[in-house]
Amino acid sequence: MKCTALIVTFNRLEKLKKSMRETVEAGFSSIVIVNNGSSDGTREWLSSLSEPGITILNLNNNLGGAGGFKIGSQYICSHSNADWVFFYDDDAYPEINILKHFSLLDTSSYRIFMSQVQDTDGRSCRMNLPFIRVPSTVFETIYYAMRPEKFSPAKTQVTDVQTVSFVGMVIDRKVLNNHLNDIHDELFLYY
């Protein structure tokens, strides 16, 4: 199974260095980094990387997460033979055994997965939590504010969800290719 990491970065060079170290150690088949017009030395550092399988896409402007992920997705879909694409930002650090854990999942029934995104203290990042159902009424929105766990999947099992965030998403490259236009880069952060 060929897995590509798609990392979007903007002006967080030290975090990107850590993310890259951990991404390389995790053993991805290839890595695509979209540099969103960073001005902090990122472009220069990226040009010094010599590991095989790393592709750098330097943009002149910051297109935000959505724009960066769209550019990276377009590149991967037209230049890669990856089976799966793992999406994350420069401040996300994949666990060393992420690919081993992913290989144990039954990928025949699902084409998109969402990783559990945690902060450095091991707490779930609320902005990256998928919804098992999206609040659709005023009552459900208030209920979500009081009891968000009722709208979030269990952490220890595969569960159907209605939403995913870019950070932590794992998607079949063929599905990604069929849905490139669904990445709305004008939203900057989310699609």
Language model region names:
Residues N81-D91:
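Short beta-strand-to-loop acidic/aromatic patch adjacent to the donor-nucleotide binding site
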Residues N35-E44, N61, A92-Y93:
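A conserved acidic beta->alpha catalytic loop
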Residues F151-I171:
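A recurrent flexible, glycine/aromatic-enriched loop bordering the glycosyltransferase active site
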